[in-house]
Amino acid sequence: DVSLHIGSFIAVVLYFYKDIFNFYKNKDLFFKIFISSIPVILIGYFFVKTGEIEKIRNLETIAWTTILFGILLYMSDKFKMTKEGKESFSLKSAIFIGLLQILSLLPGVSRSGIAITAARLLNFKRTDSAKISFLISIPILGAVSGYGFLNILFSKDSSFTQINLIAILF
């Protein structure tokens, strides 16, 4: 999982490097991205540390949530197609998208899918919804990657082979 998250993090950062490295122009955007990332990072950390996330991880849960949230994404897209999307990403919309991302902690729920669904419910265009979803993923993927990497690095079960494997996958 750690290698997958690190790879995703690197891919998103490389793709959006112009937006990221133009920080002074986009300070407001980055503040909103940070705000929208906080809920899922905090709640996710709690679920991982308490082991609650593993209690609900099973094939039936994954199947039902994938179907349910796939339908929700489809409906949010279809019912909002007739209206023009917003260009501005407000603090209120950042908080709404951030809170809905907590649902992605359920097994079978895609974080990007729920973020796109939330943005479409707020009447964002498809392209803007996807861009917001990817930008919001940067701090989340960074946090998950860092946490996972540190767990492996400082684990008593961690062996030299595991660290080499992570280094190779970079």
Predicted segments with their positions:
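Multi-pass membrane proteins that catalyze or facilitate reactions on polyprenyl-/lipid-phosphate substrates
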Residues: 1-170
